[in-house]
């Protein structure tokens, strides 16, 4: 049975600097690198106190956010959820979501299914400053 192995920190390009936010935001997409067919995977490191500038929703994709290090908060539609290490949060299609890091930063894995194919932007809608205090 064929398999694919990649190191999320060393083998994948960091797209974080392409976002118009914190310069030390880290965003590594593993879906294509791992040849995933049924799901998607990203690793994100959010600097302390930083709120991701965009909220987003998916038409068809369900996502699970797994906190591997740090803490933070997540806004899902109108509800705020506190996050700590090894929390897993499932977000269904159609729900708006955004997140921010706590004082020690936030590292998350995001698993999505189904795989969104060659143009994932067809499934997603995003809004800048969606989560405003």
Which residue stretches match the model-derived regions?
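A short, N-terminal "cap"/entry segment at the start of jelly-roll beta-barrel domains
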Residues: 1-39, 48, 121-133
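Conserved short histidine dyad/triad with adjacent acidic residue
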Residues: 23-29, 42-58, 93
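Double-stranded beta-helix
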Residues: 3, 98-133
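A generic "binding-loop/recognition-motif" signal
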Residues: 60, 79, 95, 104-105
């Amino acid at each position: 049975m064929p398999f694919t192995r990649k190191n999320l920190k060393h083998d994948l390009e960091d797209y974080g600097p392409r976002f118009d936010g914190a310069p030390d935001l880290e965003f590594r997409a593993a879906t294509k690198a791992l040849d995933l067919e049924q799901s998607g995977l990203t690793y994100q490191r959010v600097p302390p106190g930083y709120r991701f500038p965009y909220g987003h929703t998916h038409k068809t994709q369900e996502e699970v956010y797994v906190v591997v290090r740090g803490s933070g908060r997540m806004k899902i539609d109108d509800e705020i959820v506190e996050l700590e290490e090894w929390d897993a949060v499932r977000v269904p299609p159609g729900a708006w979501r955004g997140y921010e890091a706590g004082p020690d930063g936030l590292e998350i894995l995001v698993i999505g299914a189904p795989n969104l194919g060659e143009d994932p932007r067809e499934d997603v809608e995003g809004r800048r400053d969606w989560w405003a205090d």
